[in-house]
A protein has these predicted regions:
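Structured domain cores in non-transmembrane regions
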Residues: 2-116
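A eukaryote-biased signal for long
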Residues: 83-213
């Protein structure tokens, strides 16, 4: 999927509106997407982005959003709505919304090397007659597994998702109001709070089975 890029400008102002529909000035927005470029025949995709966008508006890089999803040719996808997984990187103040499941931004400094284990998560909703599929890499509420970063002195970002396609966790709703049930790859199950299975348990199952991808 292409990367989403957002630049902001102090010189070219824009308008926003309050609850009384009164306008007030805000920094200008310049948002667009750009494709990654594959490096050779391997699995590395790369893009170079200018922090100083220049031009008459003196655009400055504000935020990046990198997203990926399970490809349509994977058998597990059949009959399911696939939800993308995102990372957000902020070089300035918040420019992109929090609605991408990344959690709130955590402060980091220097280059980033992000290697995360992901497990296919199937959510069955009888209420909406729908089954969704996403990649679960931990509850992004606590800081440890968040995927949004407020950057300082960062020049290079490497994202290496490790996807365990044979370690599927399934979430099923109760017959009556109550907690969801998580069914883990080893056949065990448990009631879970909110919508998050145990990431630590998934990592343990992965380790016990040799970490097969």
């Amino acid at each position: 999927m292409p990367i989403q890029i957002l630049y902001r400008s102090e010189k070219c102002m824009d308008k926003s509106y309050n609850s009384s529909f009164e306008s007030y000035p805000v920094r200008g927005y310049n948002g667009f997407t750009q494709p990654f470029v594959r490096q050779g025949m391997g699995g590395l995709w790369q893009i170079s982005i200018a922090i100083d966008g220049g031009g008459p508006c003196q655009w400055q890089l504000n935020s990046l959003r990198v997203s990926f999803r399970i490809a349509d040719n994977i058998p597990l996808v059949k009959g399911k709505e696939v939800i993308e997984t995102s990372y957000i990187f902020d070089f300035g103040d918040y420019g992109l919304s929090d609605g991408y499941g990344t959690g709130r931004a955590k402060e980091v400094s220097g280059d980033l090397d992000l290697k995360t284990d992901y497990f296919p998560e199937v959510f069955i909703s009888h209420l909406f007659n729908q089954t969704t599929l996403n990649l679960f890499g931990g509850n992004t509420g606590p800081e440890k597994w968040r995927r949004r970063f407020r950057l300082r002195n960062t020049q290079n970002i490497l994202i290496e998702p490790v996807i365990h396609f044979d370690k599927v966790v399934t979430l099923t709703p109760p017959d009556a109001p109550g907690k969801l049930t998580a069914i883990y790859p080893d056949g065990s199950s448990e009631k879970i709070p909110h919508i998050y299975p145990s990431y630590e348990k998934l990592l343990s199952i992965r380790s016990c089975n040799g970490g097969k991808r």
